[in-house]
């Protein structure tokens, strides 16, 4: 593959992903009055990224966000409530056929 032999394939993949890490987690809301819209607004206003989903039911709020700094999202969400089922996947590695 000509692109791969020159290293341009990696450059192309990096350009496809403005935000490298797919960050997903759940926040336990059983003991707290959490508003997923307020959480989404805070994330949007304070962190760089895209593809935000903040949705929930009476027990939890699910967060999904693409960012280059997933630890900041985890740190913030941990101040809001107990976080669990944390998944951080490297989308560039996944696009290259590797484990994310």
What are these regions, as identified by a protein language model?
Residues 52-54, 81-95:
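Conserved short beta-strand edge segments in small beta-sheet-based binding/regulatory domains
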Residues 69-85:
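Charge-rich, low-aromatic oligomerization/scaffolding segments with amphipathic character
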Residues 55-60:
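Short Gly/Ser/Thr- and Asp/Glu-enriched loop/turn motifs at secondary-structure junctions
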Residues 25-49, 74:
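Short amphipathic alpha-helix segments
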Residues 10-16, 88-100:
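Long, charged amphipathic helices and adjacent flexible linkers at domain junctions
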Residues 13-30:
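Short glycine-/aliphatic-rich beta-strand segments at the starts of folded cytosolic domains
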Residues 1-12:
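Single conserved hydrophobic/aromatic residue that forms the stacking wall/gate
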């Amino acid at each position: 593959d000509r692109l791969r032999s020159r290293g341009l394939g990696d450059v192309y993949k990096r350009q496809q992903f403005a935000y490298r890490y797919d960050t997903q987690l759940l926040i336990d809301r059983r003991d707290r009055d959490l508003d997923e819209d307020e959480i989404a607004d805070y994330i949007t206003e304070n962190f760089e990224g895209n593809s935000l989903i903040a949705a929930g039911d009476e027990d939890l709020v699910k967060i999904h966000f693409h960012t280059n700094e997933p630890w900041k999202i985890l740190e913030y969400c941990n101040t809001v409530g107990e976080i669990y089922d944390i998944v951080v996947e490297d989308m560039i590695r996944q696009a290259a056929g590797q484990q994310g």
